Amino acid sequence: MVAKDYPFYLTVKRANCALDVEAASSPAKETEEPSNKRVKPLSRVTSLANLIPPVRATPLKRFSQTLQRSISFRSDSRPDLFSPRPWSRNTPAANTKRRDSKLWSETFDVCVNHMLTSKEIKRQEAIFELSKGEEDLIEDLKLAKKAYHDPMLKLSIMTEQELNQIFGTLDSLIPLHEDLLRRLQEVRKSDGSTEHVGHILVGWLPCLNSYDSYCSNQVAAKALLDHKKQDHRVQDFLQRCLESPFSRKLDLWNFLDIPRSRLVKYPLLLREILRHTPNDHPDQQHLEEAINIIQGIVAEINIKTGESECQYYKERLIYLEGGQRDSLIDNSRVLCCHGELKNNRGVKLHVFLFQEVLVITRAITHNEQLCYQLYRQPIPVMDLVLEDLQDGEVRLGGSIRGAFSNNERIKNFFRVSFKNGSQSQSHSLQANDSFNKQQWLNCIRQAKEKVTCAGKAGVLSSEACFILSPNGSRVSQGETMIEQMDQSDSESDCSMDTSEISIDCERMEQTNPCENEKQIETNV
């Protein structure tokens, strides 16, 4: 226990001692009190008695138990405004289905210490992880269809057209991975070891090109699913599934996003097998070829997914006047980043940074769909002026100061502006935190550098070396993905979906802008 916990612990301990004394002396007091005196209900006394920890519990354990029970007591005293949740103390906890995570050496009864070297054991573990991951993926895909798609269709919770949009080509992925699993199991020896996998992967990996349509549909699928969650029947069904053991406390989108997450893990899995494969092993060359194949497939799918995302948002832009239309928007194939920011009056704006133009919008609902109404004129990236406003710095006179109290410090602001002839505009935008602000600054700077380089070269290519990261965004192939796989999405009022940005400021400053084609990365 850390030092700061001691005062609270001692307070709880003294309270427990007081309860012990009160409980011990209560029988004697009852004989002396008048009969008309109000007595606490027995249920309340029992609840208080539950606060007393076991005598033999250690101090740390006693503190934990007391805290949990006191929380339970407070929640029980309130009216039941909401339906019980599986994490509530007053309802039996559901037995969440857990997945076995045994290692290869734990699964097969072999004397590995005498038969195989340490490096070979690690190689077998990596191959087994690949095979076990296929089993888990197949199980999850079948679960998504059986537990979500089919019941919602049968109960008419969603129409068949809506379900087809949300689930996409998920059905076609199941036999694809069943084929790889079958091949891996066929070459596994009776003792559980596998000698060669490289030739299998080289022959099977091209099948992953079928992921193209599934991944390209995910942006529209996620938007429709979020919209349908406003329907009470849909929300109730999904909540019941979430509380059921089979879901492992994962929502529907987690299951729908598993194929994409699996796709971007293949390069890592194959590199791990290659790392533990001897140089003179026949698999060495095949594994190197397989890695090149999967990297090319993922990069190509990522480009097409980015173009699909860009097109999706372009179709949902609403122009108040014809003068707001810009060919730079129509010709954009890449959406560098987008997200919610606030202006100096606290108004929420949704900002899109396309490859050559910055578009500031307001999110609105149009025909029961989330759309984005343009807020003033689009700003060409070539003419855009970016300014980093330091925390507490007032550069716009009273325009920012008036939006805050005298005691509140201005934080996480930056300004974008441009002037072209008689047209000029300036926007002071606030991110939700310093990290998010830095992401925006880096993304805009890199977009400007890319446009500048393209202007000198006379061409602007929309194809950069991106791969899908496990959190659904794009990262450059030069960036390691191990840390990306451990990151989780976070929601905030000023969130940002960064599709092609980098927070590596030092590298950005040290690199020649016109040689920086691989620099754009993603950090969510």
From Swiss-Prot:
InterPro entries: DBL_dom_sf, DH_dom, Endocytic_GEF_Adapter, GDS_CDC24_CS, PH-like_dom_sf, PH_domain, PH_RhoGEF3_XPLN, SOS1_NGEF_PH. One of its GO terms (cellular component) is cytoplasm. It comes from the Eukaryota. Keywords: Cytoplasm, Guanine-nucleotide releasing factor. Residues 75-98 are annotated as: Disordered. GO terms for molecular function: guanyl-nucleotide exchange factor activity. Signal peptide: none annotated. This is Rho guanine nucleotide exchange factor 3. The lineage of its organism: Eukaryota, Metazoa, Chordata, Craniata, Vertebrata.
